[in-house]
Amino acid sequence: MPSTSTGLIRDLEGTPTRDLTSSDVAFHALREYQPGDERRYIHWKSTAKTGTFMVRQFEQTRRSHLVVALTLATGDYASEEEFELAVSVAGSLGVRAIRDGRTVSVVVSTITPEFAKRKILAVRALATHVPARLLDELAVVDVAAAALNIRDVARIAADDVDGISVAFLVCGSRTTSAELRAASHSFPLGVEVVAIICDPDAVPGFRRVAGLSVLTIGYLEDLRIALARTAAVA
């Protein structure tokens, strides 16, 4: 996996917001010095020209919170191979984000027990403080008929996780375009939603569905190429 600072997921510099500050990385403009401003932000050349202390003003940058949502619902996959590929995709995205020092949440479907009277609407957040722990937890997940589908997982993740900037929805070939659209609508405006359909029998590809980026991959190696292509088209 390439660094999450490139392509679609790039955010080391951040996306500037309209909020102004005196201590961030996106330079915006100069203004007159005010009591309490740090001297290190004084712009000496402009100060000399105007005869008044001038300081740099910046735009705040939006730090990236990546969410990787993996469905464990049997109905979202046509084969065990699809599910295994989906788990590998979730692991690759999560590990890359952890190694890049990003804020990342990896969530999977909750499975409703047989004795429960109603469906449990929740997701399980996996450990993301170190790559090895995340991979250990992914190694024991499995599909289940009683697991929440990708639409429910997306909706709950959107409610539970604050400050999401990029959401990856990882599923199999049985997830329909309508279900993916509904899942993407769970996230607030401004969140980049990317659905990754894992299908070893399919030709890798990219398409846009109502503002949603949909990547189809047949092998894990396709993921890097697919993400790079998405960034080029977006």
Predicted regions and their residues:
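Exposed, interaction-prone extracellular/peripheral surfaces
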Residues: 12, 32-234
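Intrinsically disordered, low-complexity linkers and stems that provide flexible hinges
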Residues: 10-33
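Membrane-proximal, non-transmembrane interaction regions of membrane/secretory-pathway proteins
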Residues: 1-7
